[in-house]
Design a protein with these regions (language model features):
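Hydrophobic alpha-helical topogenic segments used for membrane insertion/localization
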Residues: 5-28
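Auxiliary, metal-adjacent structural segments of Zn-dependent hydrolase domains
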Residues: 73-185
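Short pre-active-site segment immediately N-terminal to the catalytic Zn-binding motif
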Residues: 187-205
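Acidic, low-complexity proline/glycine-rich segments
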Residues: 32-46, 164-183, 250-257
């Protein structure tokens, strides 16, 4: 055998081994890639690492004491809120849940996971042609980036959220109940930062979340309507991933001085319509809740006005990093909802009365649009016109 033929033989062997190795590597890439957009356990671990010492559980004695306080407080809050809203609950508010920061992460990741499952299903159906190692590798890279981003966001919010009425949108139905969650460690820390008595601050937060519970429990059609809006938005975004990327590039190229919020600029007209309907509903919910909270709070807490002022002043003093995160994630839109919705509620009550305002809860077509929230007289005229 010549030296060249020996080299060729060795080359064939090496090439064969390389081919086998490449095939195994491709299968491993395909296996690891799966079809998931997010690795939920990885997100949880990322959030936990970022929380660090803040991820410690609540001591059992503190949890028990806080749980008893919220139960008793909600019994006092319920009749006061019912009187202000002008509606009775068909059944009592759910038992409150005192949770720690990591428990809050777990609860919200469960909701995200259900939403993403539908997105993954739509994307899998839309994929043309067989899967390939290139596509699989792309999914792995994108999933890793998504894991980091979502883990960061969950850790950030887990330190900020005080109370949350979990409306159970993804299990909407006549028998579905919401859940009142209180992130006790954040409530204790905020009360200390504001230098207010802990029990007063607990009552303040419980009152705000209870008003949201009233809105959904007293008017059950709201949950189904809200769930449809969320489902509609998820379907639209999932079926338009290519167009979304193009609009995102355009939005980034336009820079920070462009008109409107960056989230709105990356939406198609159809997506923007659903988004604006959701924003309008959220605005009314927040504005109405704040109005009721103020009215009931004055009776339940002697120092309510001062406590509310301190709380709002602290919110206005957010640092540059926090403001940037809120803008990037769209959370700043939620803060705008509070203000616009409350102005709408006050204007309608001033022009008519609370009974007239409560017509927003009669059906979905009675809800105001964003344009009507900005100009309450338009909504008043439309509702009165419907009656003639």
């Amino acid at each position: 055998m010549s030296r060249n033929s020996g080299r060729i033989g060795m080359g064939i062997v090496v090439g064969s081994l390389a081919a086998v190795g490449a095939a195994v590597a491709q299968r491993e890439i395909m296996r690891r890639a799966g079809t998931r957009l997010i690795d939920w356990e990885a997100v949880r671990q990322i959030a936990r690492r970022r929380l660090g010492e803040d991820a410690v559980p609540i001591p059992a004695a503190q949890r028990q004491q806080a749980d008893a306080f919220y139960r008793e407080t909600l019994l006092r809050i319920e009749p006061a809120v019912a009187e202000e809203i002008g509606a009775q609950l068909p059944r009592a508010l759910e038992v409150p849940a005192v949770i720690d920061r990591l428990e809050w992460v777990d609860l919200n990741l469960a909701t995200f996971q259900q939403l993403f499952a539908r997105v993954e299903e739509i994307l899998a159906q839309a994929q043309s042609g067989p899967d390939s190692p290139g596509r699989a590798l792309s999914r792995i890279v994108n999933r890793s980036i998504g894991n980091q981003q979502l883990g960061f966001l969950m850790a950030f919010l887990a330190r900020k959220v005080l109370g949350q009425y979990d409306v159970s949108l993804l299990a909407a139905g006549p028998a579905t109940r919401g859940r009142l969650n209180f992130v006790e460690q954040n409530i204790v820390a905020s009360a200390a930062a504001l230098r207010v008595p802990l029990d007063e601050f607990r009552t303040f937060i419980a009152l705000h979340e209870a008003t949201h519970a009233f809105e959904f429990e007293a008017y059950p059609w709201l949950r189904d309507h809200f769930a449809r809006l969320v489902s509609e938005s998820v379907e639209q975004f999932a079926t338009d991933s290519g167009g979304l990327l193009g609009r995102l590039r355009d939005a980034l190229a336009a820079g920070p001085g462009a008109k409107g919020h960056w989230l709105e600029r990356i939406m198609s007209p159809e997506q923007l319509g659903s988004f604006r309907r959701t924003q309008a509903l959220m605005s009314v919910l927040e504005g109405y809740s704040n109005h009721v909270m103020h009215a009931a709070g004055e009776r339940l807490l002697p120092g309510f006005a001062q406590l509310h002022e301190r709380f709002e002043r602290r919110n206005e003093r957010r640092g540059a990093v926090e403001r940037a995160i809120m803008r990037i994630t769209g959370l700043d839109l939620k803060m705008e909802q509070y203000l616009a919705g409350e102005r709408f509620v006050k204007a309608v009550i001033a022009e008519r009365d609370r009974g007239f305002l409560n017509r927003v809860w009669e059906s979905a077509d009675r809800l105001p649009t964003l344009e009507e929230i900005a100009d309450p007289a338009r909504w008043v005229a439309r509702i009165e016109g419907d009656e003639h």
